Curated annotation (Swiss-Prot):
Transmembrane segments: none
Entry binding sites for Fe cation 2: E91, E143, E175, H178
Protein name per Swiss-Prot or TrEMBL: 3-demethoxyubiquinol 3-hydroxylase
Protein function: Catalyzes the hydroxylation of 2-nonaprenyl-3-methyl-6-methoxy-1,4-benzoquinol during ubiquinone biosynthesis.
Length: 212
């Protein structure tokens, strides 16, 4: 049973790093009521900026896969395994969506994805070893910071890039739900030093992934 689960998670990890992700939900599309700018072709500079932002988002989803896989393997609680598994499935949707958008923008994922994945896996295992409530608190804080990060991307994306905006908006909704679920399952509020360290690591990752 454990071996089967380990093989399944290994397969998911390979797909995360290689960009071969499965969607359980269709790609979000712009809603007419939210489109405030006419459909126009993005300039080369706008496409490059949008691609950089979506590459950062894609890296975030690679890390999310690793984190939740590790936390799922670390807990002995069936109910918490279900929480992490559901989040991982929805994060895999995000992974596939951002990958598709990068292709449409004639761009590529980060070349450092194996590094990001490995680092996040180690962090997830460390969080899991601190106990279920700390692990859930880590999940909630991760999602809270990702939500703020997505808000900033909605401010930065070109106004005419409706496709990227639709993806980011749905991702934001999902991340908020994941964070709420983690706290409702018993997550502990992390101390300020831990939250500050997470923000610092996130800044390094986002600044690097935008370009590489």
């Amino acid at each position: 049973m454990f071996l089967d689960e380990l093989i399944s998670e290994f397969d998911r990890g390979l797909r995360s790093m290689t960009g071969v992700s499965r969607m359980s939900r269709p790609l979000p599309v712009p809603q007419e009521s939210k489109v405030t700018e006419p459909a126009v072709e993005l300039s080369p500079a706008e496409r490059a900026h949008a691609a950089g932002l979506m590459r950062v988002n894609h890296v975030g989803e690679v890390c999310a896969q690793a984190l939740y896989q590790a936390q799922k393997l670390a807990t002995k609680s069936p109910s918490l395994r279900a929480v992490f598994d559901r989040a991982a499935i929805e994060e895999e949707d995000h992974l596939a969506w951002t990958s598709k958008r990068l292709e449409a923008l004639d761009s590529r994922p980060s070349l450092l994805n194996p590094l990001w994945y490995t680092g996040a896996l180690a962090i997830g295992l460390a969080a899991g070893r601190m106990g279920d409530r700390v692990s859930l608190g880590f999940m909630a804080e991760t999602e809270r910071q990702v939500e703020l990060h997505l808000d900033s991307h909605l401010d930065e994306l070109p106004a005419a890039d409706h496709e990227s905006r639709a993806i980011v908006e749905q991702m934001r909704v999902d991340e908020a739900e994941h964070g709420k679920a983690a706290m409702e399952a018993g997550g502990l509020e992390l101390p300020f030093p831990a939250r500050a360290l997470m923000r610092a690591v996130s800044k390094v990752m986002t600044r690097t992934a935008y370009y590489i």
